[in-house]
Amino acid sequence: MQKNRKNVKKKLVLIIIDGLGLRFESQGNGFALAKTPVFDRLFQEYPNSLIAASGQEVGLPEGQMGNSEVGHLNIGAGFVVYTGISIINNALKTGKFFENEKFILAFRHSIKTGFPLQIMGLFSPGGVHSHQDHLFALIDFAANFGVKKLNLHLFGDGRDVGPKSIKPWIKMLNLKLKNYENYKIASISGRFYSMDRDKMFDRVELGYNALLGKAENTFTDPIDYVNFQYEKGVSDEFFEPAINLKVNKKDFLADDHPVIFFNFRPDRARQLSHLILQTDLYEQKPKNPIKTDVFVSMMKYEGINCLVAFEEMRVENPLGKLICMAGFRQLRLAETQKYAHVTFFVDGGVELELENSDRILIDSLKVQSYADFPQMSAVEITDKLLEVGQKYDFIIMNFANPDMVGHTGDLKATIKAVEILDFQIGRICKWAEEKNFDFFITADHGNAELTEDENGNPSTKHTTFPVMLISSDKTIKLKSGKLANIAPTILDYLGLDKHPDMDHDSLIIKDK
């Protein structure tokens, strides 16, 4: 790693826009339909290229939409990071899934104690936080191993898939459960309750209580309950926690019951896991605590001490670490919704303590729908950059509003979010020129460019469209690539060597 700065002419900001892909069709396209004079000028006058941000190009299954966690991991790593879903799918393909010692430990505990096995997680084929195929495999594995009682606690998705799409999957699940006498859907709740990541513990505790068999809403048929929620105008994401009256009260989650949480993505699994295990990760403690020593997470949940079924791919030398070793002073800047992504995820999925590195968190608005506040904290993030940015050599920042507003499926709100973002990018362009900064702009995955499906219905999920890479330096040319090329590109631009772990190259076209 080069220690001198003699080749570095300017300081650099990496602007990561969350959920903004590039799509030619204008229908339902919150980016194309927005008035974006700044982006228009950048695309016309500055070096830019297309970046693959989904599927096998980022370590996901073919055709799988990208997501924020995977996107930031790949941006920082300099190589394709194979994460949760790919690792688990490969274990299913090779059969090693059905030899997993952590699952077997939970099964044996259930058989030995007579307590039901409690399996919980996001029930959809979305592939961002979980996949229902993994649940189906767990059910078969448990049954073949001899587990007699099994309770399922399903979290409605409605974001990474259509907002009202769970019914056919529950019907599939019911058909499977008919083969097993004491395997039941014990509770249903929306991810809004069970998968919060913003310390909304009043909300999370409602999801937690449903695991314990404590909820205001009840059902005897899960399909009937879904229909009841739809009639109230409630989509999958916001299902009010409910419990199955056909499940014996003593069979809901209680002391010493074995638990498997089949979400592989950690960020939205940590708070609920904390309530069950009563960790030191958060101050909040459950009003109805239970104790269990057999809690299996699909992948590692940072800060949660439990059994981990599958080991993650390690990123030992991410971009931020190399920048630190070169003596650059760094800043990471984002609002709450994406703060973990510009710190934990872009640093390889670990909490790195880097010298000469500061982190600034701007609070996200605590609202039920960002469609009502499409600006989110974009203005405050830009204000903070303009206030303190000149003190740093290298800055990674994130704008969350295209993604979070895109998740609402509200086209008008998404257009507004993009227009607000465009204005903030314009402010940064002016500031960068005044303060002698260069910048690269990219995105972690698509979303805002497709807020309606072909029938005009809201689309709330991510996409497989490519994203942008824009440089403020008109003296260079960029070729197309994938997110794993971004770290080598930045290091190359700054005159620094990439680490040998980084098997992807810079996208800056060299003169022959």
Swiss-Prot record:
Residue positions binding Mn(2+) 1: D403, H407, H462
Catalytic activity: (2R)-2-phosphoglycerate = (2R)-3-phosphoglycerate
Single GO MF annotation: manganese ion binding
Binding site for Mn(2+) 2: D18, S68, D444, H445
Keywords: Glycolysis, Isomerase, Manganese, Metal-binding
Free-text cofactor note: Binds 2 manganese ions per subunit.
Cofactor(s), by name: Mn(2+)
Pathways involved: Carbohydrate degradation; glycolysis; pyruvate from D-glyceraldehyde 3-phosphate: step 3/5
GO biological process: glucose catabolic process; glycolytic process
Top-level division of the source organism's lineage: Bacteria
EC number of this enzyme: 5.4.2.12
A family per Pfam: Metalloenzyme
Catalytic residues as annotated in Swiss-Prot or TrEMBL: S68 (phosphoserine intermediate)
Gene3D superfamilies assigned: Alkaline Phosphatase, subunit A, BPG-independent phosphoglycerate mutase, domain B
GO cellular component, one term: cytosol
Function summary: Catalyzes the interconversion of 2-phosphoglycerate and 3-phosphoglycerate.
Family: Belongs to the BPG-independent phosphoglycerate mutase family.
Protein name: 2,3-bisphosphoglycerate-independent phosphoglycerate mutase
This protein's encoding gene: gpmI
